[in-house]
Amino acid sequence: MSLTLERGAIAPLPVLQDNIIWIWSCGSEAVVVDPAVAEPVIEALQQKGLTLIAVLQTHHHADHIGGTPDLLRQWPDAAVIASGQDRGRIPFQTQPVAAGTRFTLLGVPVDVIDVRAHTSAHLAFFLPEGCSPGGHPPALFCGDTLFSGGCGRLFEGTPDDMHRALQTLATLPESTRIYCAHEYTEGNLRWAHALQPEDRAIKARLEDVIALRTQHKLTIPSTLAEEHRSNLFLRAQSAAELGRLRQLKDDWKGF
């Protein structure tokens, strides 16, 4: 797997059908976010001469934690950072964290944000100073909560939960890069355009996304500013509106 990594960089590793594993590196050390599988991660890190020091787990679903046990066999000293409320479902975690706390990785602060909705203990990890000191934009690892053009399904939460979570994320800086865990942008925007064909921001973004996907390029990370303009779920004014949109999206058969 060819991976382009610079010092203090976050790089995507596409796996399975649409998962994105994020590899955040600085110097010779790396942090991996939501590793669905291990083999391509091991290959990529070894290719770049990187040592895994930590795994960030946003939630317990198999396509986010499936590769972690094998990564720990390869790098047994790596920390596994996850919600302390989810010890039963992420039993190999070594550093339980709680919402509202801060820790340091690769020399920069990481804030833990409660975004329970998709699952009951879902966390997001926010890097207010970016992925390394020195002027990088803020970064958000948000798992399956805020997607590019969409939001996660409500498996264990309610529309109120998701609305609260998204409104919390909406207060972050507009320049924040959104590192979500799936490449869902085209489908999300096709649905949004079908629902609101007159919305110019959605239409323009969809055209850009289709052009990228035609070239087999990723559409993420996006920015919070872009999501404010064209993400119907982030724009929802109430939990009731979000719930209506979520049901419409769940029932949509278009893409």
From Swiss-Prot:
Annotated function: Thiolesterase that catalyzes the hydrolysis of S-D-lactoyl-glutathione to form glutathione and D-lactic acid.
Positions of Zn(2+) 2 binding: D63, H64, D144, H182
Cofactor binding annotation: Binds 2 Zn(2+) ions per subunit.
Descriptive protein name: Hydroxyacylglutathione hydrolase
Organism: Synechococcus sp. (strain WH7803)
GO molecular function: hydroxyacylglutathione hydrolase activity; metal ion binding
Catalyses which reaction(s): an S-(2-hydroxyacyl)glutathione + H2O = a 2-hydroxy carboxylate + glutathione + H(+)
Entry keyword annotation includes Metal-binding: yes
Cofactor annotation: Zn(2+)
KW Metal-binding (keyword) present: yes
Binding site for Zn(2+) 1: H59, H61, H118, D144
Keywords, alphabetical: Hydrolase, Metal-binding, Zinc
